[in-house]
Amino acid sequence: NGTRYESATLLCENLEEELKCQARTSMLMGSGAMLNLALDAKANQDKMKTVINWGNNTDVTYGGQLSAVTRFFKTDGKKPILQADIDVLPTQIILNDSVWNIRPSHLALDSGRVFIDNFLVERPNQYLRIDGKVADKETDSCLVNLKNIDVKYVLDIVRFDAVEFSGQATGVVNLKSILKDFTMNTHLNVHNFAENSGLMGEADITGAWDHELGGVRLEAQIEEENLSATHVTGYVSPKLKGLDLMIDADSTSIALLNPYLEGIFSDLNGRVNGFVRLHGPFKALDFEGKVSAAIDAKVDVLNTY
């Protein structure tokens, strides 16, 4: 898949009826940073303990440890099925220099289904909690609960940088039939929502997965109290590698358009009213529309304000 590795080692030993394996590698990230990965596993009879460590080499730290104990067993009958119980152990991870606690939780693997019982990653006044089933039936759902999760963290992890979004998201993501006809519905409130570093206010966002688009159709109402209101509808599609958003602006900060006006204007500040369509492939987004604006800006070609 184009991922580059600097080096890798694998060592396995079978001592005193215990199998030990160690794996080490360094992965080159797109930014040029190096991500170091290490896996240690010990297996004895029907039990295996696994520890995964990782860390980067940049000024901002991303790293940590995942640890779990897995017990394997088979069902009774003529066609026994291999199953597994996984106890996630308490550890810590570091995201953007912030320490997060992974709390004890339980997972079970049964006939191609994964049961998740209260998987929790948290720090003061922030958490991500997962409960439910990863399976192929429409009635099988998995709930992801968020509290004050930084939107930018999530987008950095999935390497989405076509548009810069930020803010602290609280709400629920409902995933169904994950292994077959995947559906997703979400309702999030985002505090201090910003687009392209332009603060837009408090956002109420609903979204649903669209199979044909291979992406999310969304609707958002964003307000700065007694100052502005912005209504957004459209979609973001990883499958099509593009987006199409209709923005109804009422005294909305013009800062959200800054990246698309580079080379024409700079130091752009002010408010806009009207309709803007932001659309196109992620790597070549364009905008069009009709707006009225009260702005201050530097005209680069004239070097004047």
Question: Model-predicted segments: where are they?
Answer:
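Interface amphipathic segments
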Residues: 1-305
